[in-house]
């Protein structure tokens, strides 16, 4: 179909649509990620039991996409809308939501809301799905409730939205090795991703601390490799262990179910099988994969980098090829992640086989041996119709010909790869690392470092300025990374990931210039959606963040900020509780020894967050 349909509809509506409602203030539109173009007008479209959804016959992917709207309506409103698969022109005079194939790009959509109808144009199932996600965000936040909500008018503000993504790859990562998470939680994780138009789930499945994927040819990987005998308590340096065996793995049946679930939400799952480092759990099961320099190997019980890595010998390559053969049966993704990071070379330096191989191949050193290792695996993976992506370190010793780079060590690796005309996903720490503190460490749970605040993540530009226009084309996307050393529960994952992932999602989708103030206003509404989805996000958005900067031996300079829009910060210096009568923060000030800075955010005369303090 072509764009003739909306024009015909417009002509018909001149006759059929009348202003039957009194004028009213337009609802504020708060969509995350921000659409490329949005224009709001007066009026609303009301959804009720008489509303129908009209789709073109035979388009099963679009029918599945609009089913997500009905699923939400059934839970929150108590009813769903009839879906009419027919020629929409035959129903031009009826009240409804018209979902039309207008030949747009795959993920693009065009949404027009008028008082008499809604038209959602797309170029296929993905565009229709993303249009539905935006449509849901135009409705009252109660649409995300799991139980029926009474007394709500299910109204869409009249508007015109044209939208398409900035990047093809919009990713979110989850490490399920350092801590294990159930399939039910992963489905919820994917649901929240999909709401934000995030379309890649990078699933970290193998590590030193546990192997999480069933491989039928190598049953010990899950019979033994899933387990570690105990886990370090607290930080890496604590020296204390809990003495409790820890394990968990995903059966192939569970994986297939999750892959299907994700695909229905236009999320592609990219599995990560680490090589040649971070392999201790596998080596503990099959010691012949190592260089054989130790008498005993066991799955790691603490975090960090371990010297036990895969030995580049035929037994190892046969093992890895067998593993990937089963991986390819489970994951239809063209991309597979091969890790490639943090591979110590100590074993290879001592290993007679490795040294002989370096000499035989005419390699310069162990770094080039790692490059050869990865290139050999890339050839096999390419032969099976797949492509590899790996962390920055795959650049060391020479980049495999067809490899994509996931830049995590700052921007340098991404810049270098893009300049070599290799595609890059930007996932730099600390900018996109969600295991870092997001607020004052004094009031936050244990984390890897930081802080990396919501604002820092929002304002980061994932396309480095040093790249030329041509080189910038090789930046294909972004990813937020969730490493779970200090996230033992689903609740902690949600707390660390959201709402910061909202900022990363917007950087991945939205092309336009950034506006922090506008983002926070949209986000405040959006948090109501996350509340109703039972997402346990961090509420530091409402809390003052106090920082003390060096001044003199006897004084420091205090700065205070808060993310919540239109909030005043009130503070005290004498240890008393700040109230609306306390001084308003207007800029940096001097703090002397033995003073306590206490601060709270207040809006419209009411406290909106927690009181925070900092002692000097």
Where are the model-predicted features located?
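Contiguous, structured surface segment used for ligand recognition
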Residues: 20-167, 492, 507-520, 524-533
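Short, compositionally stereotyped local motifs that mark structural "simplifiers"
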Residues: 31, 54, 63, 520-616
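Feature activates predominantly on carbohydrate-active enzymes
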Residues: 104-335, 376, 380, 479-483
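Active-site-proximal loop/turn and secondary-structure-junction residues that shape catalytic pockets
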Residues: 205-209, 217, 273-279, 342-344, ...
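Flexible, acidic glycine-rich loops studded with aromatic residues
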Residues: 388-393, 398-403, 409-557
């Amino acid at each position: 179909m072509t764009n003739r349909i909306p024009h015909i509809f417009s002509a018909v509506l001149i006759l059929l649509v009348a202003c039957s409602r009194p004028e009213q203030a337009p609802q504020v539109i708060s969509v995350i990620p921000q659409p490329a173009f949005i224009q709001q007008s007066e009026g609303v479209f009301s959804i009720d039991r008489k509303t129908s959804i009209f789709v073109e016959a035979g388009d099963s992917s679009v029918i599945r996409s609009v089913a997500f709207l009905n699923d939400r309506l059934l839970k929150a409103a108590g009813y769903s809308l009839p879906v009419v698969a027919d020629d929409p022109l035959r129903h031009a005079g009826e009240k409804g939501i018209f979902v039309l194939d207008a030949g747009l790009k795959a993920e693009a959509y065009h949404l027009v809301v008028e008082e008499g109808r809604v038209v959602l144009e797309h170029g296929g199932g993905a565009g229709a799905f993303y249009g539905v996600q935006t449509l849901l965000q135009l409705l009252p936040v109660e649409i995300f409730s799991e139980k029926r909500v009474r007394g709500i008018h299910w109204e869409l503000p009249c508007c015109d939205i044209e939208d398409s993504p900035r990047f093809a790859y919009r990713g979110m990562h989850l490490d399920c090795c350092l801590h294990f998470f159930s399939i039910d939680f992963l489905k919820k994780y994917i649901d929240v991703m999909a709401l934000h138009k995030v379309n890649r789930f990078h699933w970290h499945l193998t590590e030193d601390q546990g192997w999480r994927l069933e491989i039928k040819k190598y049953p010990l990987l899950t019979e033994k490799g899933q387990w570690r005998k105990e886990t370090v308590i607290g930080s890496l340096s604590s020296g204390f262990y809990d003495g409790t065996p820890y394990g968990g793995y995903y059966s192939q049946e569970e994986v297939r179910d999750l892959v299907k679930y994700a695909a229905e939400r236009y999320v592609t799952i990219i599995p990560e099988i680490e090589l040649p480092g971070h392999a201790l759990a596998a080596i503990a099961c099959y010691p012949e994969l190592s260089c054989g320099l130790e008498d005993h190997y066991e799955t790691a019980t603490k975090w960090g980098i371990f010297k036990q890595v895969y030995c580049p010998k035929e037994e190892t390559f046969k093992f890895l090829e067998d593993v990937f053969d089963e991986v390819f049966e489970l994951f239809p993704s063209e991309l597979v992640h091969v890790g490639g990071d943090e591979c110590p070379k100590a074993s290879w330096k001592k290993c007679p086989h490795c040294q002989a191989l370096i000499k035989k191949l005419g390699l310069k050193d162990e770094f080039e041996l790692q490059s050869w290792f990865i290139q050999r695996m890339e050839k096999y993976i390419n032969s099976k119709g797949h492509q590899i992506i790996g962390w920055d370190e795959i650049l060391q010793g020479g980049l495999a010909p067809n490899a994509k780079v996931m830049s995590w060590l700052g921007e340098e690796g991404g810049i270098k790869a893009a300049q070599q005309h290799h595609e890059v996903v930007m996932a730099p720490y600390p900018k996109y690392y969600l295991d870092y503190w997001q607020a004052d460490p004094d009031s936050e749970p244990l984390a890897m470092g930081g802080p990396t605040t919501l604002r820092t993540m929002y304002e980061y530009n994932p396309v480095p300025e040093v790249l030329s226009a041509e080189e910038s084309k090789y930046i294909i996307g972004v990813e937020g990374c969730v490493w779970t050393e200090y996230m033992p529960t689903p609740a902690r994952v949600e707390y660390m990931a959201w709402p910061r992932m909202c900022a990363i999602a917007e950087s991945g989708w939205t092309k336009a210039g950034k506006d922090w103030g506008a983002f926070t206003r949209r986000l405040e509404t959006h948090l109501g959606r996350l509340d109703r989805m039972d997402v346990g996000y961090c509420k530091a958005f409402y809390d003052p963040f106090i920082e003390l900067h060096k001044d003199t031996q006897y004084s420091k300079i205090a700065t205070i900020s808060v993310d919540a829009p239109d909030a005043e910060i009130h503070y005290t210096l004498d240890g008393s509780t700040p109230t609306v009568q306390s001084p308003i923060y207007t800029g940096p000030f001097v703090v002397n020894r033995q003073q306590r800075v206490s601060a709270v955010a207040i809006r419209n005369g009411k406290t909106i967050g927690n009181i925070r303090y900092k002692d000097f």
